[in-house]
Amino acid sequence: MAQVINTNSLSLMAQNNLNKSQSSLGTAIERLSSGLRINSAKDDAAGQAISNRFTANIKGLTQASRNANDGISLAQTTEGALNEVNDNLQNIRRLTVQAQNGSNSTSDLKSIQDEITQRLSEINRISEQTDFNGVKVLSSDQKLTIQVGANDGETTDIDLKKIDAKQLGMDTFDVTTKSAKAGAEIATGTKITVDSDATKQADADVTGLAKGQTLVSGTDADGKSAYFIATKDDATGDVAYTKAKVADDGKVTDSGTDAGVKNPLATLDKALAQVDGLRSSLGAVQNRFDSVINNLNSTVNNLSASQSRIQDADYATEVSNMSRANILQQAGTSVLAQANQSTQNVLSLLR
């Protein structure tokens, strides 16, 4: 090797190795301090892209799990309201069974009907006012879509139905109206003409009605013959009309009434079945959301583990790398000092 002064190749070599060890030490310290093997794309470009996609999926699935929990909360809120509707219907049914007993006076029936009316009003209030996060869950038929995945189209629907007295077929429910049974013979009593403006014409002759039930004949708005059973309440003077079919012998063959009057218990059973159907649907969707949440959590765990293997730093490896780089730094600094002294030997030739 030539003895030169202008270029110290040994020093340059030592500096280059010292820079390499310095870079390795910096990388090891960065990874140990951040806990990440990939701190920028230069560390692992492909790994960084894969890890970023995992991050998007993990965050989306985590939010989807929260969405499913919100769906459970909505279903629970709705079912709680339906439970109150069910309780009111059960009490109305009990009162209706009580009203079917022939020992009840008109006053008793009126008291029973008053309570039934209040309970039906409460059902309407529940329908109108039950709210979850601004959504009226029982005020209309609607479908709520819950996002339960990280991608488009990954949804679950909650079908909600309007539940009020009208939808349950009970908006005209009345236990105070008594109708004649088919085959019963009705006294003609005082003659009353009932035409298309039935109410006003009948009111004028209320005092002439015989006690109990009286057969009323007249014509409807189309000019056809029509028959009604008029029942007078002696206490109040009120008259209730029930449309009827009458045979030639004067016997009632059928008395047409509202469903809530003709078959009140069947009407209530149908209403209860309607509420039970919606409650069953809500219970099923809650179980479905539970399954969705379990699956989402499992997927998030697996994706997180996969992301960790790509992105997270292995501390055992990085500590070893840091120790190695630290030793090389110390050795490189010492060697560089020796290399810088090598040019001093050239000066001895000038002495």
Curated annotation (Swiss-Prot):
<keyword id="KW-0975">Bacterial flagellum</keyword>
<dbReference type="InterPro" id="IPR042187">
    <property type="entry name" value="Flagellin_C_sub2"/>
</dbReference>
<dbReference type="GO" id="GO:0005198">
    <property type="term" value="F:structural molecule activity"/>
</dbReference>
<dbReference type="InterPro" id="IPR001492">
    <property type="entry name" value="Flagellin"/>
</dbReference>
<dbReference type="InterPro" id="IPR001029">
    <property type="entry name" value="Flagellin_N"/>
</dbReference>
<protein>
    <recommendedName>
        <fullName>Flagellin</fullName>
    </recommendedName>
</protein>
<dbReference type="GO" id="GO:0009288">
    <property type="term" value="C:bacterial-type flagellum"/>
</dbReference>
<dbReference type="Pfam" id="PF00700">
    <property type="entry name" value="Flagellin_C"/>
</dbReference>
<comment type="function">
    <text>Flagellin is the subunit protein which polymerizes to form the filaments of bacterial flagella.</text>
</comment>
<dbReference type="GO" id="GO:0005576">
    <property type="term" value="C:extracellular region"/>
</dbReference>
<keyword id="KW-0964">Secreted</keyword>
<dbReference type="InterPro" id="IPR046358">
    <property type="entry name" value="Flagellin_C"/>
</dbReference>
<dbReference type="Pfam" id="PF00669">
    <property type="entry name" value="Flagellin_N"/>
</dbReference>
<comment type="similarity">
    <text>Belongs to the bacterial flagellin family.</text>
</comment>
